[in-house]
UniProtKB/Swiss-Prot annotation:
Listed PROSITE patterns: FE2OG_OXY
EC number: 2.1.1.122, 1.14.11.-
Keywords noted in UniProt: Dioxygenase, Iron, Metal-binding, Oxidoreductase, Transferase
Family matches, as Pfam families: 2OG-FeII_Oxy, DIOX_N
Domain Fe2OG dioxygenase stretches: 214-314
Binding-site residues, 2-oxoglutarate: 305
Record text on cofactor binding: Binds 1 Fe(2+) ion per subunit.
Species annotation: Papaver somniferum
Reactions the enzyme catalyzes: (S)-tetrahydropalmatine + S-adenosyl-L-methionine = (S)-cis-N-methyltetrahydropalmatine + S-adenosyl-L-homocysteine; (S)-canadine + S-adenosyl-L-methionine = (S)-cis-N-methylcanadine + S-adenosyl-L-homocysteine; an (S)-7,8,13,14-tetrahydroprotoberberine + S-adenosyl-L-methionine = an (S)-cis-N-methyl-7,8,13,14-tetrahydroprotoberberine + S-adenosyl-L-homocysteine; (S)-stylopine + S-adenosyl-L-methionine = (S)-cis-N-methylstylopine + S-adenosyl-L-homocysteine
Anything else known: No detectable effect on alkaloid content in RNAi specific mutant.
Molecular function GO terms recorded: (S)-tetrahydroprotoberberine N-methyltransferase activity; dioxygenase activity; metal ion binding
Binding residues for Fe cation: 238, 240, 295
Cofactor(s) the protein needs: Fe(2+)
Protein name: Protopine O-dealkylase
Amino acid sequence: METAKLMKLGNGMSIPSVQELAKLTLAEIPSRYICTVENLQLPVGASVIDDHETVPVIDIENLISSEPVTEKLELDRLHSACKEWGFFQVVNHGVDTSLVDNVKSDIQGFFNLSMNEKIKYGQKDGDVEGFGQAFVASEDQTLDWADIFMILTLPLHLRKPHLFSKLPLPLRETIESYSSEMKKLSMVLFEKMEKALQVQAVEIKEISEVFKDMTQVMRMNYYPPCPQPELAIGLTPHSDFGGLTILLQLNEVEGLQIKNEGRWISVKPLPNAFVVNVGDVLEIMTNGMYRSVDHRAVVNSTKERLSIATFHDPNLESEIGPISSLITPNTPALFRSGSTYGELVEEFHSRKLDGKSFLDSMRM
């Protein structure tokens, strides 16, 4: 049975609101927000951020086309994007623009609430669901220059009653609709990935079956202006844990960067597009064929940035490991099997973010 223990998303600690801190117009940021050298936006010896390369773009209309040649070309693009980049943008995805506009305005409205209102949705001791910060594992840990609101949306019976049902009505209705649309989009991508991977017919549904009764979590991110952006980080470099993440940029301020061949590349969201990335669990299931990659959020000194990341992960009781038909004498298993997704959730969220350290712990 799925238990409340399995769905406690980590060990959150009470941290001051960065949004409120930014209102103090500080000349210098507190020491807890100063990054280690390797996590600075441009650490000594790092490659210059490349603004000329762009992540691949996948056209969903072509991906689901009834014309075999059109579908095959887009499948090849999807397969290449997952292997070479681990990130891509999707266009012509079918999500109504009015819903996207509501997501943008309602989340902005939430972060515009007074602190007294937002704290009603604050994280409980030992859990990161709610308003606060994620992945704070110790009192001396460097903190991200961001506030978040994290909420589990699927499965329905595991929603926290003190959170979802208490959200302001417009936001609650918007998140409900958005949750449904994101699940539909993610399932299209999972099913097409199966086809692109050309796994054996007996296992052709192995990926989509694992995600059919998915765990879905949303994280709304608020990155306020920072007086010393060169010393801070909005989101520590890391790879995502689960299956697929679908990110929506809520305003025009850029900040997402991905690591590709040792260089940090700024992602410039296309109009009416979503940014999608492969998570650690999907890398494990594809035995390393599809890549989860390090990414981070940087901040600036003048403008706030907002986004919402929707994580699409397996159901809690699914056993996670490489798909057996992808294991051959020439491609032996790279990752261990045997743990359920629920067990891995607890392990992952008990850590601080640290690159791909969790995935590395799963290697054979």
